[in-house]
């Protein structure tokens, strides 16, 4: 009888040891009070995965003068510990203070840039003085005059309909515009992709060209040389309906991988589109080198090709079976991971993995979920949650850092009401112990 008891006791000891090891491996992170992290309990079914609201970064982007809202919100780490931020549609002007957060007179540049300087600890600085806005101000001298702390669009589309005189007065192109893609540092310069958009009479926001802009990194943030626009190739891709390069991954194999999601009706009777992640790559890390597209042939066999995919090729070239949006790829250990939002406008953000940066990305797990309400005054519910962008340059301890975009039900709700200045601006979240999802 003692041998079965010995076996049972040994199994018990083994299970107990494994449990203790798991508790040690997935211990709660050592947080500092100044980080302003607020736990969101029960956000993930795995008890080791810990999701936090980042109230420090929320406060940094709760702004009342100049930039006071915007979407897009992507970052790129620059030399010297600086962080480059890009925004799409933004509000510039004035909002009231924390007691009411009412957005007042603001204009609406279609893209905008900012640089975050490092703090004394070398991490991205968490003071307002660490934000250097690369804004072309309309005027900042007379608070009673039109255009006070308004801003012009950073990069105009060459087909923009406004005259130079109208632009100087602070008017904004609305028919042809650029939205920001991802960016990377190559040979001491910043290379950035821009998505040309045609906003016709029905506000359809149709994709058009893909441009590449090159910026200087000479000097320091705030100096005339730093992030000076050196060149723009507006016709790098004359027509880019898929939108490759919304996000990038610079791999050790010498290529930069360019991700997008291709949306299409998978079946004739479908009410909603499918959104399939797809990938291209530049031949070298220089984004101006020739691009290759990862495409499946009619038999399902993938290959790299030099020609831009046809709609039929794109439909069969998904690098994940999941229908998602805003794919971000990074590498940790021997695995490549992709984070992405469930399609369409789902509150859930997923993570999946692959052995290569071109996929397939499977083994999909729920990572975190956007709260149903925002931490703001006035109306707290939002209409859409979209573009949860990953910010590796903001991570302190290997956690995953996300910004979110949320809009309000009616355009007028962005103005003149309590809390209106806290729609259409980023909120930030951090996910710790995320790798525990793949040890279940």
What kind of region is each of these model predictions?
Residues 13-15, 71, 275, 350, ...:
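Generic detector of short, well-ordered, non-transmembrane alpha-helical segments enriched
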Residues 75, 183, 246-248, 327-329, ...:
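Hydrophobic core register within WD40 beta-propeller blades
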Residues 1-23:
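Bacterial Sec-dependent N-terminal signal peptides
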Residues 21-66, 77-176, 185-238, 252-324, ...:
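Beta-rich carbohydrate-recognition and catalytic domains
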Residues 69-71, 177-180, 242-244, 323-325, ...:
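Beta-rich catalytic cores
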């Amino acid at each position: 009888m003692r041998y079965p008891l010995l076996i049972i006791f040994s199994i018990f000891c083994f299970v107990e040891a494994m449990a203790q090891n798991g508790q040690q491996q997935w211990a709660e992170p050592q947080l500092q009070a100044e980080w302003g992290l607020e736990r969101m309990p029960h956000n993930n079914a795995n008890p080791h995965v810990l999701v936090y609201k980042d109230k420090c970064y929320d406060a940094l982007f709760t702004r009342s003068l100049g930039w006071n809202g915007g979407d897009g919100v992507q970052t790129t780490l620059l030399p010297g510990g600086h962080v480059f931020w890009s925004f799409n549609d933004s509000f510039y002007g004035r909002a009231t203070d924390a007691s009411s957060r009412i957005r007042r007179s603001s204009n609406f540049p279609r893209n905008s840039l900012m640089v975050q300087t490092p703090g004394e600890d070398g991490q991205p600085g968490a003071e307002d003085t660490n934000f250097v806005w690369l804004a072309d101000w309309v005027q900042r001298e007379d608070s009673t005059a039109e255009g006070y702390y308004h801003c012009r669009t950073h990069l105009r589309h060459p087909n923009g309909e406004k005259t130079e005189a109208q632009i100087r007065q602070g008017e904004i192109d609305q028919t042809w515009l650029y939205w920001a893609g991802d960016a990377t540092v190559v040979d001491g310069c910043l290379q950035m992709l821009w998505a040309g958009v045609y906003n016709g009479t029905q506000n359809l926001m149709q994709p058009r060209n893909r441009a590449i802009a090159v910026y200087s990194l000479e000097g320091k943030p705030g100096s005339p040389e730093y992030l000076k626009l050196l060149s723009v190739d507006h016709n790098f891709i004359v027509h880019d309906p898929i939108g490759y390069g919304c996000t990038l991954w610079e791999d050790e194999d010498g290529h930069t991988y360019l991700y997008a999601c291709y949306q299409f009706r998978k079946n004739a009777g479908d009410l909603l589109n499918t959104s399939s992640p797809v990938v291209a790559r530049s031949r070298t890390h220089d984004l101006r080198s020739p691009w290759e597209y990862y495409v499946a042939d009619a038999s399902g066999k993938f290959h790299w090709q030099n020609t831009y995919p046809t709609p039929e090729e794109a439909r069969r070239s998904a690098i994940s079976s999941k229908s998602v949006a805003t794919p971000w790829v990074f590498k940790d250990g021997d695995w490549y991971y992709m984070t992405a939002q469930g399609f369409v406008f789902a509150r859930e953000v997923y993570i999946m993995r692959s052995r290569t940066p071109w996929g397939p990305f499977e083994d999909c797990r729920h990572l975190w979920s956007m709260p149903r309400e925002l931490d703001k005054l006035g109306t707290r519910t939002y209409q859409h949650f979209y573009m949860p962008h990953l910010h590796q340059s903001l991570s302190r301890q290997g956690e995953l850092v996300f910004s979110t975009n949320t809009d309000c039900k009616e355009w007028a709700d962005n103005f003149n009401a309590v809390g209106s200045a806290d729609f259409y601006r980023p909120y930030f979240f951090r996910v710790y112990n995320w790798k525990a999802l793949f040890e279940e």
